[in-house]
Design a protein with these regions (language model features):
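A short His-aromatic
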Residues: 119-123
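Conserved class I S-adenosyl-L-methionine
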Residues: 1-44, 144-167
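Short alpha-helix
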Residues: 170-183
Length: 183
């Protein structure tokens, strides 16, 4: 699974069609999602932060004037890491980028105050990734993920209209996975 995801992202997904559809549907949910994200991200100020993925920090952290003590961004794709590094060249936030699998994080236990990501968990073996997130999260730490949901009718439509914009192993989250987060 990890190798298939890595290859798909290194080779580049066909996101043009997805972005055209997304432009016409995003107003239905992005404003509220972005407000929730911004409110929650204030917790990351001055904290040790881990992003699963290596792109969202630009919009979520840098563009909102959040300054974590340390920001580590992981990705299994070297191409995605390179994109994150390009974004960081002119940023006041200087993330540390790591080519790393979220199923086996190479960080010490209880290393991070805050772990977040955008549209990443649905690419992973959910339970394995969640175990690793909990392992590296400090007691009292927080997690925040914005993920596609299998129950979202707009998301379903976008997925049907843009099958080549995703990998074979992607699976939108359902209520079952969300309730596991509460544990």
């Amino acid at each position: 699974r990890v190798q298939r995801e890595q290859e798909a992202f290194n080779e580049g997904l066909q996101r043009d069609g997805y972005m055209r559809v997304f432009e016409h549907t995003s107003h239905l949910f992005l404003k509220r999602r972005d407000q929730i994200v911004c409110d929650e991200l204030e917790y990351a100020q001055g904290k040790n932060v881990l992003e699963l993925g290596s792109i969202s920090w630009k919009a979520w952290i840098d563009d909102n004037d959040i300054e974590p003590a340390n920001l580590h961004c992981i990705n299994i794709s070297q191409e995605e890491i390179k994109q994150g590094e390009r974004n960081a060249r002119f940023s006041k936030v200087k993330p540390h980028f790591h080519l790393m699998d979220a199923h086996s994080l190479e960080f010490e236990d209880e290393s991070f105050d805050f772990v977040y990501g955008c549209a990443i968990l649905h690419h992973l073996d959910y339970n394995r990734a969640l175990d690793e997130i909990c392992r590296v999260l400090k007691p009292g730490g927080r997690i925040l993920f914005a993920e596609p949901l299998g129950i979202n009718p707009v998301g379903k439509l976008v997925r049907v209209m843009t099958p080549f914009a995703r990998t074979d192993d992607e699976k939108p989250l359902m209520f079952k996975e969300l309730t596991e987060l509460e544990k």
